[in-house]
Amino acid sequence: MDPIREGEVAHEGDSVYTLNDFTKLEKIGEGTYGVVYKGKNRRTNAMVAMKKIRLESEDEGVPSTAVREISLLKELQHPNVVGLEAVIMQENRLFLIFEFLSFDLKRYMDQLGKDEYLPLETLKSYTFQILQAMCFCHQRRVIHRDLKPQNLLVDNNGAIKLADFGLARAIGIPIRVYTHEVVTLWYRAPEILMGAQRYSMGVDMWSIGCIFAEMATKKPLFQGDSEIDELFRIFRVLGTPTELEWNGVESLPDYKATFPKWRENFLRDKFYDKKTGKHLLDDTAFSLLEGLLIYDPSLRLNAKKALVHPYFDNMDTSKLPAGNYRGELELF
């Protein structure tokens, strides 16, 4: 539990922190961007998550563009976005200090019993809160790009928060994480898988669709082990896209005319529990999912539209961290 040695450079901000202001307690994980430690703010005694960012070119130091971009993320203050409290540079290393939450959505789902599903009201509440956070960030032109259950953190009061916003653009997504585990493709939008150079907020909406489906079934919807396998798993469930439903798909760099032509859509079958004979998503929930998994990114539901989908009509928002926020810019 030794204090970290004095940082030479601290972030600019209201309270200037150095690494000496934090005590490392234990390593809690290895994320997409490097090692994560549980730590303590020695000024406030609050628990924090300390991310030591692994940079591809450590010998060259931290790119100033990355520091600038990351510093902007301190402005993303929303009750459903994990707060970035400080950006600290030490030599050529970068530490990001975040508020601490001990549990992520994946661990929460993993500890449910074998035949136990997420309660329907929790499924709805979590989905709504994820969309609230996404809408807030998208309106500020920040795309997540690497959304998955591991970077959705939950607390004991029914809140869910998005972590690692904007880091994909600031740092880039590595192919592998620290442990040489391949960064998951299961939540990646088809336009990225087919090599689109320019993409939009729609990539996050696709990821939310995949996460919504997984919260309902406890199983990843498209569990590919390579980019082409991921793509074909999507095609097998939704049908292979054509120019008819996705204008421009055949012009994408990695589109191949030789792709197998699956024609049927089997999405509904994924939500049928054979044991109980029940559908895990009702018609309005399924309609929201279909809107999030539209192939053409320009037709895919955006976060603001998703927040007013009929699925959320009877939503009790009184106890949610961001209340009834549905994309009104002036709220935060």
From Swiss-Prot:
Annotated positions binding ATP: 28-36, 51
Reaction catalyzed: L-seryl-[protein] + ATP = O-phospho-L-seryl-[protein] + ADP + H(+); L-threonyl-[protein] + ATP = O-phospho-L-threonyl-[protein] + ADP + H(+); [DNA-directed RNA polymerase] + ATP = phospho-[DNA-directed RNA polymerase] + ADP + H(+)
Any GO BP annotation: positive regulation of meiotic cell cycle
Activity regulation statement: Phosphorylation both activates and inactivates the enzyme depending on the site of phosphorylation.
Molecular function terms from GO: ATP binding; cyclin-dependent protein serine/threonine kinase activity; protein kinase binding; protein serine kinase activity; RNA polymerase II CTD heptapeptide repeat kinase activity
Principal subcellular localisation of the protein: nucleus
Modification(s) after translation: Phosphorylated.
Active-site annotation: 146
Broad enzyme group: transferase
Sites of Phosphotyrosine modification: 33
Keywords: ATP-binding, Cell cycle, Cell division, Chromosome, Cytoplasm, Cytoskeleton, Kinase, Mitosis, Nucleotide-binding, Nucleus, Phosphoprotein, Serine/threonine-protein kinase, Transferase
GO cellular component: centrosome; chromosome; cytoplasm; nucleus
EC number: 2.7.11.22, 2.7.11.23
Residues that span the membrane, as ranges: none
Residue span(s) of domain Protein kinase: 22-312
Residues with the Phosphothreonine modification: 32
Keyword set includes tRNA processing: no
Superkingdom, natural source: Eukaryota
Compartments it resides in: Nucleus; Cytoplasm, Cytoskeleton, Microtubule organizing center, Centrosome; Cytoplasm; Chromosome
Known partners and oligomeric status: Forms a stable but non-covalent complex with a regulatory subunit and with a cyclin. Interacts with cks-1.
Family stated for the protein in its record: Belongs to the protein kinase superfamily. CMGC Ser/Thr protein kinase family. CDC2/CDKX subfamily.
Protein's recorded name: Cyclin-dependent kinase 1
UniProt gene name: cdk-1
